[in-house]
Swiss-Prot record:
PROSITE patterns: TRANSALDOLASE_1 (PS01054), TRANSALDOLASE_2 (PS00958). The keyword Repeat does not apply. GO terms for biological process: carbohydrate metabolic process; pentose-phosphate shunt. CDD domains: Transaldolase_TalAB. The lineage of its organism: Bacteria, Pseudomonadati, Pseudomonadota, Gammaproteobacteria, Alteromonadales. It comes from Pseudoalteromonas atlantica (strain T6c / ATCC BAA-1087). Its EC number is 2.2.1.2. Homodimer. This is Transaldolase.
Length: 317
């Protein structure tokens, strides 16, 4: 009898949400995703010490400016860990643009170009890479530009339908709507501590986005992310992709409960309407307190972990 993880793999592309090489080897996902928080966690592990030393040594060769050396070392470390991962998984690695650039379209494009160039130097083609960008208006516009260059993007920190609509209209390759962080917000605001999986507001958000994309014929891949429990995951069985932490992958592999397909692509039935412009996007975000707060919080937290990572790298200079 197959376990839930095996059953899920039959209907959904399973992605590992980790920078831990050993976990990736164990669970054998198709793709893997990283972010500044996961990179910091990996960088603090003893087995990655040589990666940090090598990244700093490389950065010193690129510039005499101390601040630039740390930025370069951070980029090199992200790509080095990403290269390790992409040599294990058959699919793609998602590598994130510095969250501090979330409101700067041009700087985000330039950082993406730098990451792609570093991967190329490591022998990894851009077809194996997804550039992660926060789903701000500026991040979405950066993705629109990069997609036209043939650089595929993963739009992350996505909490609202407006963000999802704008990403699809921009031609983004993939979005990462966050499930658990939406649930966190509702729990904090309502005081309600238990939600059935089908009533989970994060699950409902991803379900709405998935159905909208399929009904309107959008090709953008929906990859549910940020899960708090396996109930959220099983309720989204059938989603294009789900990126799951090692702890929840383990829970799924230890469960033999039956798995039912919840999301199905029944084909395009509706023509897309008028696209969102910047004013409409910002208004829709303003009207969604949860999305506004969680996007801002997510950017702050990723930026803070990037600073912690850079502080760690400074100790190697």
């Amino acid at each position: 009898m197959s376990n839930q993880l095996q059953a899920l793999r039959d209907i959904t592309t399973v992605v590992a949400d980790t920078g831990d090489i050993e976990a990736i080897k164990k669970y054998q996902p198709v793709d893997a995703t990283t972010n500044p928080s996961l990179l910091l966690k990996a960088a603090e592990m003893e087995q990655y010490r040589s990666h940090l030393e090598n990244a700093v040594a490389w950065a010193k060769e690129q510039s005499d400016d101390a601040d630039q050396q740390i930025i370069d070392a951070g980029d090199k470390l992200a790509v080095t860990i990403g290269t390790d991962i992409v040599n294990i998984v058959p699919g793609r690695i998602s590598t994130e643009v510095d969250a501090r650039l979330s409101f700067d379209t041009q700087a985000s494009i330039e950082k993406a170009h730098k990451l792609i160039a570093l991967y190329k130097e490591a022998g990894i083609d851009k077809s194996r890479i997804l550039i992660k960008l926060a789903s701000t208006w500026e991040g979405i516009k950066a993705a629109e530009h990069l997609e036209k260059e043939g650089i595929n993007c993963n739009l992350t920190l996505l909490f609202s339908f407006a963000q999802a609509q704008a990403c699809a209209e921009a031609g983004a390759y993939l979005i990462s709507p966050f499930v658990g962080r939406i649930l966190d917000w509702y729990k904090a605001k309502t005081g309600k501590t238990e939600y059935a999986a089908s009533e989970d507001p994060g699950v409902q958000s991803v379900t709405k986005i998935y159905n909208y994309y399929k009904e309107h014929g959008y090709k953008t891949v929906v990859m549910g992310a940020s899960f708090r429990n396996i109930g959220e995951i099983t309720e989204l069985a059938g989603c294009d992709r789900l990126t799951i932490s090692p702890g929840l992958l383990e829970e799924l592999s230890n469960s033999d409960a039956p798995l039912e397909v919840k999301l199905k692509d029944t084909g395009a039935t509706t023509t897309p309407g008028k696209p969102l412009d910047e004013a409409a996007f910002r208004w829709e975000m303003n009207q969604d307190a949860m999305a506004t707060e969680k996007l801002s919080e997510g950017i702050r937290n990723f930026a803070a972990d990037q600073v912690k990572l850079e502080t760690l790298l400074k100790s190697y200079v």
